[in-house]
């Protein structure tokens, strides 16, 4: 096993919308990398069951994307709730890094953090208070080096595990092309 307090935890959530007061988590996935962005382990990815009333209340964008990806059907058929997904995710992460050591890594992670705080508070507490948000580098590249930003094409599937893989690859790209750092 590759336990180290330098490991990075990457997380992505799919939700029924953007408002944690009204919307809920419908998918969670995690990946653990070392500090060089080498993938050490892919955590369990869970479609999280939510009541039909909540799913039918989704806006058109979420309904369309989560139907096209197959996530909506997986959510309806899932028996996993938020507490079970949180517990199993924590059990996986504890094998790779101590609590409070890894920043929350991914794209637009402040949004994920809002939902974790409300619906998965134990998992939220497991992360360091800092974030490693790849979106920051994307925004900087768009403003300071638009040719570098334009050369990186990212096609989100809006499936949590693939979105994490894409975020890791995006950070590798910016490390090499924007920051001019090799592995």
From Swiss-Prot:
Q: Which residues form the Exonuclease domain?
A: 8-171
Which Gene Ontology molecular-function terms are recorded? 3'-5'-RNA exonuclease activity; nucleic acid binding
Q: Where is the active site?
A: 129
EC number(s) reported in the record: 3.1.15.-
What class does this enzyme belong to in the EC scheme? Answer: hydrolase
A Pfam family it matches: RNase_T
- Record-stated family: Belongs to the oligoribonuclease family.
Q: What does this protein do?
A: 3'-to-5' exoribonuclease specific for small oligoribonucleotides.
Please identify the protein, giving its name as recorded.
Answer: Oligoribonuclease
Origin organism is: Coxiella burnetii (strain RSA 493 / Nine Mile phase I)
**The encoding gene:** orn
